[in-house]
């Protein structure tokens, strides 16, 4: 059984952070630090004796680190300043701290990972690289702006571009430049009653500037954010995943995985099955769906799904990839719809043929892109000394760990986990938030309503002010309560008590009506408070000083 690790939980309090390991060791745990994790991971990687084609893994690692560092520096320097050491050999030998996320408007807890990349790299005199996961889907181009008060609030959906068919971020251009350019002003105006000075006002002009240069939606957002980080003093590099997977050394590793596709398929599904068993997960789609097998054409044999996506310039929908190896020395890939390509990829063919085949796909505008688990496998095995995950990624990468063990027999490098929670600072605008607790009050109202149903006598007027009928009903109920529930009387006893309760409801109508009148406003207030204080609001809705404090850039 794989050694699946415990699940992390997002911090609850605003401003709280989860950083494992810490940037620097504490007196209580001197061995728990990023420096120790780097050293341990290098020992784990040195134990890998797996051959990737005609290369040992460590040889491929050295070559990949050189390529990734070089290309990441060139990419970053295309839009902001970045440090590129003169001594390339020393640069490659230093620790590399890596992380990544989709180029969307994520919450501050995700952005904290980028701050941790910088802090970790400084602590070990290394280089931080953030992967822009532009191979993921661009699902929507609007943001929910919180509008209202703690009594009643809602999200106003504000678009930053016109809608389009779903496609990978790397393919998504900007459809309506004027809509994109005006987003900062429109969103800031709506947000003003809650947060009058969001960093959005300062940041969005950078996004508009980058959009005018790159003309790609996700890349414009990512480059603008990264440019802002430069003003914060963070010294990180960035690289889109779509660029990383085009590197020859990465193509060698991809080719090796594809050449052993059936083993990968089996390891992937076995790891998912073990994860579900260990964590008692019943849903077939959790944590990720199983890879399928199809037998659409019996004469061709089975087509087994692989953890990649495929699309073409003519049809940019990301589709699942199925592989067939019935022809010796050939790997057939298909979306089981319209795309089919045959590649000279097998355990017997050379890595140079793997690279040539994958390069030709790119030249013919066919995109073969790894899913999340394979992307982080590449980063963790070939490049990073430490990969920094958020909570969700850390949970998914337990599967990656087990897949690596099944394919290589070796333990993969360990990852770091960083997340945090920051809520909009609305207490100053609405002091009643601290003075009231609608959740507790709503629970009390529901308790009273239940008590009115089953114990109405507790809510009647004092005895000397009660009508005689009410007194009689109380007496009848008490006599039945005092009656021993024998087998013959149990049902009648229950009916009589219930009947007395129902008849007493006449005398508590006013109390019940007042309580019911409070349920709606309290529930609305609870929903409004949850919405306003959600941890999911985009980082750009927060004031700069609050963000800097949260991101470890300022004290206090």
Explain the meaning of each model-derived region.
Residues 121-142, 408-419:
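Glycine-rich phosphate/pyrophosphate-binding loops
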Residues 394-405:
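Short active-site loop/helix that positions an aromatic residue
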Residues 190-355, 359-364, 370-371, 375-378, ...:
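Aromatic-residue-lined binding/catalytic grooves and analogous aromatic/hydrophobic interfacial grooves
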Residues 135-139, 245-252, 420-432:
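Short, conserved secondary-structure transition motifs
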């Amino acid at each position: 059984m794989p050694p699946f690790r415990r699940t992390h939980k997002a911090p609850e309090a605003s401003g709280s952070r989860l950083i494992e390991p810490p940037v620097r060791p504490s007196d209580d745990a001197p061995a728990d630090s990023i420096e120790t994790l780097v050293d341990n991971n290098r020992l784990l990687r040195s134990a890998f004796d797996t051959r990737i084609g005609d290369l040992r893994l460590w040889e491929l690692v050295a070559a990949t680190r050189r390529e990734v560092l070089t290309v990441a520096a060139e990419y970053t320097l295309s839009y902001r300043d970045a440090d590129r050491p003169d001594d390339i050999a020393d640069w490659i030998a230093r620790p590399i701290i890596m992380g990544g996320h989709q180029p969307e408007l994520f919450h501050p807890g995700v952005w904290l990972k980028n701050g941790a990349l910088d802090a970790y790299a400084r602590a070990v005199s290394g280089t931080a690289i953030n992967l822009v996961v532009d191979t993921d889907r661009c699902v929507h181009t609007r943001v929910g702006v919180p509008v209202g008060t703690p009594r009643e609030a809602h999200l106003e959906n504000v678009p930053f571009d016109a809608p389009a068919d779903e496609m990978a971020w790397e393919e998504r251009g900007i459809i309506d430049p004027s809509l994109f350019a005006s987003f900062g002003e429109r969103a800031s105006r709506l947000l003003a009653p809650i947060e009058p000075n969001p960093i959005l006002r300062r940041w969005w002009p950078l996004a508009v500037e980058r959009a005018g240069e790159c003309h790609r939606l996700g890349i414009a957002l990512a480059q603008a954010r990264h440019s802002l980080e430069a003003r914060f003093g963070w010294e990180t590099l960035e690289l889109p995943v779509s660029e990383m997977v085009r590197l020859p050394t990465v193509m060698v590793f991809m080719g090796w995985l594809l050449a052993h596709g059936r083993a990968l398929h089996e390891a992937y599904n076995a790891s998912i099955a073990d994860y579900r068993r260990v964590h008692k997960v019943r849903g077939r789609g959790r944590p990720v769906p199983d890879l399928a097998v199809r037998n659409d054409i019996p004469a061709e044999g089975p087509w087994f799904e692989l953890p990649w996506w495929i699309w073409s310039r003519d049809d940019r929908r990301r589709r699942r990839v199925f592989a067939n190896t019935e022809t010796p020395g050939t790997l057939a890939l298909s979306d089981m719809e319209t795309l089919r390509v045959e590649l000279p990829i097998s355990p017997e063919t050379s890595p140079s043929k793997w690279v040539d085949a994958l390069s030709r796909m790119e030249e013919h505008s066919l995109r073969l892109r790894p899913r999340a688990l394979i992307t982080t496998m590449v980063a963790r095995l070939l490049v990073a000394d430490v990969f920094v995950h958020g909570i969700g990624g850390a949970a998914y990468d337990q599967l990656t760990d087990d897949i690596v063990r099944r394919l290589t027999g070796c333990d993969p490098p360990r990852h770091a986990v960083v997340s945090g929670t920051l809520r909009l600072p609305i207490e100053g605008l609405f002091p009643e938030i601290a003075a009231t607790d609608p959740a507790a009050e709503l629970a009390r109202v529901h308790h009273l309503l239940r008590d009115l149903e089953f114990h109405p006598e507790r809510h009647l007027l004092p005895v000397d002010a009660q009508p005689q009928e009410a007194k009689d009903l109380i007496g009848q109920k008490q006599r039945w309560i005092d009656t021993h529930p024998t087998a013959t009387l149990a049902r009648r006893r229950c009916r009589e008590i219930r009947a007395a309760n129902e008849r007493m409801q006449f005398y508590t109508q006013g109390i019940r009506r007042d309580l019911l009148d409070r349920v709606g406003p309290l529930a609305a207030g609870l929903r409004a408070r949850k919405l306003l204080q959600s941890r999911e609001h985009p980082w750009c809705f927060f004031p700069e000083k609050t963000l800097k404090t949260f991101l470890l850039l300022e004290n206090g």
